[in-house]
């Protein structure tokens, strides 16, 4: 264990998601050895993002304005909303260039072990968006893990009573994958999500 400022830096870096003790130590020593101007730019970038970036008042995506660029874009279809867990998921969907609707960022997923229930997510804001009657379909695009599935099921059951079409992203076998290596859940989902071979 180091002393003083070095250990404090390692500890703070270790609090970042996905950064373990070894990575935190490597990052800390990289910072110590880096050019001071590079570190000044890093500090300025972090400070700027904390000062200027906020969440879109409509969808919850990151933005520097009141509304994000997707909510401001009149070419987007306002009748379809893709519900995702985090802002980074918006970017992942956008990279596909397959979706031209709008988004709703929940800010996480239901995770009782971590103390995250529906009330900690932006579900109330989603329901508010549905009040105007313009939305015809909700696409649930949560992660295909336990928390994402719990969140998707919760949303689907809740939205079913409203009478809006609720769909879930298909999941199954990856392109180029081998059946023999697929786990049972993935293979089962592939069967459930099968479609006409000629469509």
Curated annotation (Swiss-Prot):
NCBIfam families named in the record: recR
Alphabetical list of Pfam families matching this protein: RecR_C, RecR_HhH, RecR_ZnF, Toprim_4
InterPro entries per record: DNA_Rcmb_RecR, Rcmb_RecR, Rcmb_RecR_Znf, TOPRIM_dom, TOPRIM_RecR
Protein name (Swiss-Prot/TrEMBL): Recombination protein RecR
One of the record's GO molecular function terms: zinc ion binding
Zinc finger (C4-type): 56-71
Function of the molecule: May play a role in DNA repair. It seems to be involved in an RecBC-independent recombinational process of DNA repair. It may act with RecF and RecO.
UniProt xrefs under HAMAP family: RecR
UniProt keyword Secreted, yes or no: no
PROSITE patterns: RECR (PS01300), TOPRIM (PS50880)
GO biological process, alphabetically ordered: DNA recombination; DNA repair
Family: Belongs to the RecR family.
UniProt key word DNA damage: yes
Matches recorded under SMART domains: TOPRIM
Residues in Toprim domain copies: 79-174
Keywords from the named record: DNA damage, DNA recombination, DNA repair, Metal-binding, Zinc, Zinc-finger
């Amino acid at each position: 264990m180091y002393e003083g400022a070095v250990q404090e830096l390692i500890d703070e870096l270790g609090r970042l998601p996905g950064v373990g003790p070894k990575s935190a130590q490597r990052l800390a020593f990289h910072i110590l050895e880096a050019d001071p101007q590079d570190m000044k730019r890093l500090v300025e970038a972090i400070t700027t993002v904390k000062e200027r970036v906020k969440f879109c008042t409509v969808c919850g995506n990151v933005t520097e304005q009141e509304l994000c660029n997707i909510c401001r874009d009149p070419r987007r279809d306002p009748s379809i909303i893709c519900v995702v867990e985090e802002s980074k998921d918006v970017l992942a969907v956008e990279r596909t260039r397959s979706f031209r609707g709008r988004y709703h960022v929940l800010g996480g997923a239901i995770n009782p072990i971590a103390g995250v229930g529906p009330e900690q997510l932006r579900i109330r804001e989603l329901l508010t968006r549905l009040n105007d009657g313009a939305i015809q379909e909700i696409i649930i695009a949560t992660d295909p893990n336990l928390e994402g599935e719990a969140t998707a099921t919760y949303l689907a059951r809740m939205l079913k009573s409203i009478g809006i079409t609720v769909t879930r992203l298909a999941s199954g076998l990856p392109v180029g994958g081998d059946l023999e290596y697929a786990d049972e859940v993935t293979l089962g989902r592939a069967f459930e999500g099968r479609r006409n071979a000629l469509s």
